[in-house]
């Protein structure tokens, strides 16, 4: 009977433990990609610049994803970025990063 009670307690504890509902870093990077692509679509730039930026967007997306994962960005930051609807909102979310996380993000962007 005692063993049965222990099993019930273990099951109850497991049921109470839920996985974080915060979006993963891939979703953060995907939102950045969507916003950057949309902004580029409306930008007044010459075709060569548009092509060059378009070609860089996947690398920028991947660098953001890696910085997010490697820096263990908080659920609050990830949620903020996924909900961002424009570049200014995304930048506001970046202000929630720690100094070290922001430095790592800037460093990864500088290598592109």
Q: Where do the protein language model's features map onto the residues?
A:
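Positively charged n-region of N-terminal signal peptides that target proteins for export
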Residues: 1-4
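N-terminal Sec signal peptide cleavage junction
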Residues: 15-16
């Amino acid at each position: 009977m005692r063993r049965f009670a222990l099993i019930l307690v273990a099951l109850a504890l497991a049921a109470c433990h839920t996985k974080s509902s915060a979006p993963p870093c891939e979703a953060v990077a995907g939102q950045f990609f969507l916003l950057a692509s949309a902004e580029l679509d409306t930008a007044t730039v010459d075709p060569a610049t548009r092509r060059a930026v378009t070609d860089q967007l996947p690398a920028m997306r991947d660098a953001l994803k890696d910085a997010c994962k490697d820096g263990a960005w908080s659920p609050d930051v990830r949620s903020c970025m996924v909900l961002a609807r424009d570049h200014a909102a995304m930048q506001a979310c970046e202000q929630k990063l720690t100094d070290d996380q922001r430095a790592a993000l800037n460093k990864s962007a500088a290598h592109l």
